[in-house]
Amino acid sequence: LVALALNTKIVKISKININIAYSSKNKEYRESLLKRSIKQSIRSYYETLFCLSRSQKILNKSIFKVENRFLYSQTNRDFGLILLSAHNRSVDLLLNQLTIQEDVTAIFKPIKIKALNEYVRKNRQKSGSSVFETNFTGVKELFSALKRGEAVAMAADQVPAKNMGVYENFFGRKVYTTNLIPSLHSKTKATIVSVAIHSDSHTNQLYIRYGSKSAYKEKSQYNAKTMNKEIENIININPEDYNWEYKRFKKQEVEDRSIYK
């Protein structure tokens, strides 16, 4: 599978992204990271299929441990909770594990194949989450959930639709970035806690790690720049866990149409 993957478009995009994100690293480091990343991407695809096809009882055994749970459990919930994540391993498995603790409202980009989209949506909701497409209705549902003091989750590392973002720094490039989470935070006073699935580099066991916490009362304003920095922090814990095959740098403040050609 790895040999096959090394000849695909996925590898080309991943290589470009890794070279941008870790331009200060030497060639040997970047090439090694690329190979390890492809292996972990294949594994994360399996994790998604596993998540969508197995019973909740089996899925509950898939995570080895949870780090910094106190960031989640000791949060004032009067204004709701925003769980910030990125496409680090399987977002489906992460959402599933988050909803074991409580109901979570999340948004996602629909899959073009209608039947597959409905299948995925149905299975994403089996553990108690409410999922909506990334559109006006979906955003409205996020606001409503926060107003009720509930939790919402979003992977905020993809290029947003036109007029739905701002240009902000991400691994040294000014890229088009969603401003939805900063907007939700500003309008609802909800606390933001970052969370992602990682793999242990020694044992390959999966674990969930809660990262930083940002509250509305803090002096520094939470914005897209702060959000992107936290996503970088998530990725840098174990860069091979990140799904580098997405064209994250395709829309930059300084246009570069040839970047993925």
Per-range role (PLM):
Residues 41-43, 65-66, 90-94, 112-114, ...:
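Short hydrophobic/aromatic-rich motifs at helix boundaries and adjacent loops
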Residues 6, 130, 218-222:
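Short, surface-exposed alpha-helical recognition segments that flank or form part
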Residues 63-65, 113, 132-135, 174-175, ...:
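A conditional alpha-helix N-cap/helix-loop micro-motif detector
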Residues 79-136, 162-169:
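Catalytic core of membrane glycerolipid acyltransferases/transacylases, capturing the structured
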Residues 31, 35, 73-77, 100-101, ...:
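Non-catalytic C-terminal accessory region of glycerolipid acyltransferases
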Residues 1-85, 118-122, 126-128:
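Membrane-anchoring hydrophobic helices of lipid-metabolizing enzymes
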Residues 14-17, 94, 119-120, 138, ...:
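Hydrophobic alpha-helical segments typical of transmembrane helices
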